[in-house]
């Protein structure tokens, strides 16, 4: 049986292969496909460097495992702050990227210390894929705990709301899980 570790490693490898060509248009990639690790392109980082997607996935996984399998969104937000401010969960102690919505939400959490689920951004333009990228640990969590669809939607909404409170982010995350 494939373990959750295999999925996380596969996620990190895929992310590291995509980082150099992030924001590259499809036509250019069709002419010059990525078939191995490369570096020093879009984000000007060495090959094998992963992005915020993997870092936040690792932070999510760390939060769940250190909380004995519980979901504690404030702890998760604290781990995200460690990543954002200290470079934890990165290959070299430096963050590669952070989207504006996540930056604003974590800034609000740090400043107010309100419940993390009340710090996510609510605008119609704050519905990117940022929370979707950290759902793999939630897939494992939901599977291991035999969660039904209504509980998955509630769980995903809470976790997404640390940065993204828009309904689209919640529904797409729940659909993935």
Task: Please give the residue ranges for each predicted region.
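An N-terminal structural lobe/cap that precedes and organizes the functional/catalytic core
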Residues: 1-52
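Acidic catalytic motifs of isoprenoid enzymes
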Residues: 41-131, 142-147
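Active-site glycine-rich loop that binds ribose-phosphate moieties when present
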Residues: 152-162
């Amino acid at each position: 049986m494939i373990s959750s570790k295999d999925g996380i490693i596969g996620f990190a490898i895929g992310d590291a292969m995509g980082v150099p060509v992030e924001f590259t248009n499809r036509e250019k990639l069709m002419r010059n496909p990525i078939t191995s690790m490369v570096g020093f392109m879009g984000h000007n980082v060495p090959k094998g460097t992963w992005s915020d997607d993997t870092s936040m996935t690792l932070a999510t996984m760390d939060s769940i495992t250190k909380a004995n399998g519980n979901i504690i969104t404030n702890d998760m937000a604290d781990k995200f702050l460690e990543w954002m401010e200290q470079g934890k969960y990165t290959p070299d102690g430096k963050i590669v990227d952070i989207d504006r919505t996540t930056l604003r939400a974590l800034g609000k959490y740090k400043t107010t210390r309100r419940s993390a689920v009340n710090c996510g951004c609510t605008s119609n333009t704050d519905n990117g894929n940022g929370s979707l990228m950290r759902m793999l640990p939630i897939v494992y969590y939901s599977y291991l705990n035999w969660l039904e669809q209504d509980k998955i939607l509630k769980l995903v909404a809470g976790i997404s709301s640390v940065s993204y409170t828009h309904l689209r982010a919640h529904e797409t995350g729940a659909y993935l899980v």
